[in-house]
Amino acid sequence: MVEDADADRLAASLAGRLDAVTFTDLTTDQVTARLIDAVADWAGEQGWRVYRRAPSVLPLPPPMSARQSVLDVACARPDGPPVVVEVDHGTRRRTWEKLLAEADAGRVTLWVRWGAGRFTAPPPPIRMVSCAVHRRPDPTGVLHSRRPRADRLPPVHSAVPQGSVDAVELPLPPTVSPGAEG
């Protein structure tokens, strides 16, 4: 089985790479393709051999069980076990089965899960790399957009800079409205 520290390090590295991925108004298929490209680029930057649509160790279910499933990206590393990556918009049991079979074969398994909602964590030893994407309806379907994390600044809470403030002892005394007589 693959070392947890190696898998965690690779998941964090890929997450850092995906943080820089941006796009506007892409379809679901286009987003998946863009993320697969980013994963392949990340792996290539590591100096690894990169294979797209590589055969999985898991066969397809009947009636196509004579054929193999494919992985979105598989990587051969000179300094460690192979790395396999699946990129999905939804949570599919079949993806988990495929990645678990790959982990049993000694590979580091990374699952890039993208979308706008909550993500269900996969079973160990699969590492999830989440990628938050905004969606909006369009007459042609749903379109997705993403800004890098660095551009998503926290909201400004006050437009006027505040100077020093004086502490006030609680409870506050009742206030008298202007024009009201006491």
What kind of feature is each model-predicted range?
Residues 16, 20-32, 37, 41-79:
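Active-site metal-binding core of divalent-cation-utilizing nuclease and nuclease-like domains
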Residues 42, 102-106, 155, 162:
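Conserved short hydrophobic interaction patches
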